Amino acid sequence: MDKIGKDRNDKYDNGEEMQMKITAGLGSIDEYERFVHAGADEFFCGYVPNEWTKKYGTVMPLNRREVLSYNVQIGSLGELEILAAMVKEYGKPVHLTFNALYYIPEQYPEIAEMIKKCMRIGFDSYIIADPALILYLRKQHIDCEIHLSGETAEVNTGMVDIFQQMKLKRVIFHRKNTIEDMKSVITHVQRQNVGDTEGKRDVRPLQSRLEFEAFALNELCQFTGAFCNSLHCDEMGYLCRVPYLLTCIKNGQQRNDYITCGKTTSDRDDIPGQETPSIEIPAEDDTGYLPGVSGCGLCALYRLKEAGITHLKLVGRGNYTDFMEKDIRNLRRALDILKASKTEKDYINSMKKILFPYGCSGNCYYRQHYYRSKK
């Protein structure tokens, strides 16, 4: 790690070691207190007023989580007021999400008014995916804190330069960014702030520095969010949940050589010339819980910290509350192990021994890093 990164990301201004913070998904206000006690540093949650749902339905989503049948988001200003009181009591901030990739023209003033109401009761930070909405808010002189959503797709140095003109507080890297990509962007931003001479220290207060967030646990998706056109609602299954088999297609191979929806691996015909892989299923606990079963980046925490990541996203709005609480506790435990480890190898060995004694899911967020570390 270069000197700029070390000075900028590993130490607070008082010399104390800087730790990556846990940003956890919140499905309802009932979860807030439990998740605070579990170890979350901050939260993100959706807010879709009932008035919006009645007017636009599910086909024009506000945050791409238009689900009503279980707890995924908050649906009234009254609930937000209760949550605001809890935030004031515990001091753990909540960021509201507006993750739709675009809106129609008439919706921008409506969203701006919605954000003003939320700001009046104490919510100052917003996760936004639509660049036009960010620009609109700034042109309306709405001075809220903006986090660039992980649904915004490609993140590179040129993109960050443009968005910094709109006074971003945080960049959330999307699921397909490699650790090398993240480090390149972060180093670029740091050198802009302190100059090209290594060893200089960023003397700005922490509150004014650009933060960087990466996915750490749950909901690894095969698609890139910015190019996903699936509706996430009660009326139909998510496109990313449709079963499929990823395999090589060979010239002349017949249609019936492929797996069909509904078949299991055990009853399909083997693909000619290939052996059916055997999959070892790791042991879950007695409640059916396994950390990171839908996506895990715990092995990469050492590299993420080296790259300059300041916050770790723990996805899980709508998950079982008990499982989310365990996820937060396990991510906190992994960070404690990281703090006590001198090398990456020490960290991974200790973390796997404690959190995955019977094996992990193998569903890696940062697979390139994982395979490189295994060589």
Regions found by a protein language model. Give the residues of each.
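A polyampholytic, Gly/Pro-enriched intrinsically disordered region
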Residues: 167-174, 235-240
